[in-house]
């Protein structure tokens, strides 16, 4: 547990940056020196934090390029004093174009209208704007399909002033599954798109397709760059071999016991008196609620926290507080800490166990942890 003297907040997340550094070393060893690792920091690195992690990756792990989901994430990183290359993976609304051009943000290009607007802004400012062409290999989201669609795009953008086509990429739809037929087809589709780009006379510095599962499982699809968020923070749920890189989970989340109530058998409590005590109970009121980002489908559905090294079922969760059953845990006191997720000392709440009955993924869980939860970064 951390020394919280002088720190405000009803719950807190600890992120161990040295564990991130060790994870980076293991990822780089896995992909080899001829492949570049591009850390993905979208969604505030899935709730782990944004600016501090970006700064650490550049200053301590020697990264010269990061990627994010939206322009505003790139802006936050720039405002923190981080001046490396930043690639925005998501679509860029046209009102963001002046910012990305002025601040040297690389964006995703998948349609000619965006390319023309970006070109006009770059020419107006007397500069160039870097882009990565997105190829739709099957996911059906952003990107141009190889064939006539990509040919038309290349015809429209080739030679546009102020545009530097630095790279091309795709995003696999199914790289986590045992069956490899889909990823093989999507890689072949991506290859055909790269061939079209080359035939159009465009030389690419970077080609990338591998997300987290593909980075671990399919070295043949690494090209010269791979992207991952989850590997960075210690999660690899590869179906054929769990955590084969030996990564370390970098985050844990703790809250507090705000009050302890004695509840008699048959007594009702919670909003709408929705809960009824099945026996004489001790119920701890939590210092956190769903507005802190804890998923609302876990209470009463296998969700639990660790209190004094023992599992305590979550009975219900309100906006700012909730109810936890501590009847069978002795000597619990007000202000004792609860572990919500991660490992701290001998206590651990393992994500796959916690989410066993949930409809949500691990990335969803972490992305929900909001700004109200204090982040503590250990360097």
What are these regions (language model features)?
Residues 2-16, 21, 72-73, 92, ...:
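Active-site anion/phosphate-binding pocket segments in diverse small-molecule metabolic enzymes
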Residues 6-7, 11-22, 29-206:
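Active-site-proximal beta-alpha core segment in soluble small-molecule metabolic enzymes
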Residues 28-31, 275-277:
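Short secondary-structure boundary/capping segments within folded domains
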């Amino acid at each position: 547990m951390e020394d919280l003297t002088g720190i405000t907040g009803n719950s807190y997340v600890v992120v161990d940056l040295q564990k991130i550094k060790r994870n980076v070393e293991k990822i780089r060893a896995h992909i080899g020196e001829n492949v570049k690792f591009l850390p993905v920091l979208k969604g505030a690195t899935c709730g782990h934090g944004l600016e501090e992690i970006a700064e650490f990756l550049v200053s301590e792990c020697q990264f010269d390029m990061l990627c994010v989901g939206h322009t505003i994430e790139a802006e936050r990183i720039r405002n923190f004093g981080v001046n490396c290359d930043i690639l925005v993976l998501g679509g860029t609304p046209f009102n963001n174009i002046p910012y990305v051009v002025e601040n040297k943000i690389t964006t995703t290009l998948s349609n000619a209208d965006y390319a023309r607007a970006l070109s006009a802004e770059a020419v107006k400012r007397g500069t160039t704007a870097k882009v990565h062409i997105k190829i739709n290999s099957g996911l059906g989201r952003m990107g141009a399909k190889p064939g006539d669609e990509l040919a038309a795009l290349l015809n429209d953008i080739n030679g546009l002033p102020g545009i530097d086509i630095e790279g091309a990429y795709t995003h696999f739809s199914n790289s986590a599954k045992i069956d490899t037929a889909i990823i093989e087809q999507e890689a072949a589709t991506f290859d055909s798109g790269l061939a079209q780009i080359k035939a159009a006379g465009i030389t690419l510095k970077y080609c990338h397709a591998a997300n987290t599962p593909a980075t671990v499982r399919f070295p043949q699809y690494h090209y010269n760059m791979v992207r991952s968020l989850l590997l960075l923070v210690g999660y690899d749920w590869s179906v054929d071999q769990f955590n084969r890189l030996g990564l370390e989970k970098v985050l844990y989340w703790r809250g507090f016991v705000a009050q302890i109530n004695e509840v008699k058998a048959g007594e009702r409590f919670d909003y709408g008196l929705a809960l009824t005590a099945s026996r004489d109970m001790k119920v701890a009121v939590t210092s956190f609620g769903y507005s802190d980002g804890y998923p609302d489908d876990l209470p009463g559905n296998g969700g639990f926290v660790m209190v004094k090294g023992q599992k305590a079922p979550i009975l219900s969760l309100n906006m700012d507080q909730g109810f936890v059953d501590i009847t069978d845990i002795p000597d619990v006191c007000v202000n004792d800490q609860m572990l919500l997720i991660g490992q701290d000392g001998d206590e651990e709440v393992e994500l796959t166990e916690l989410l066993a009955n949930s409809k949500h993924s691990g990335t969803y869980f972490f992305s929900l942890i909001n700004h109200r939860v204090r982040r503590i970064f250990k360097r």
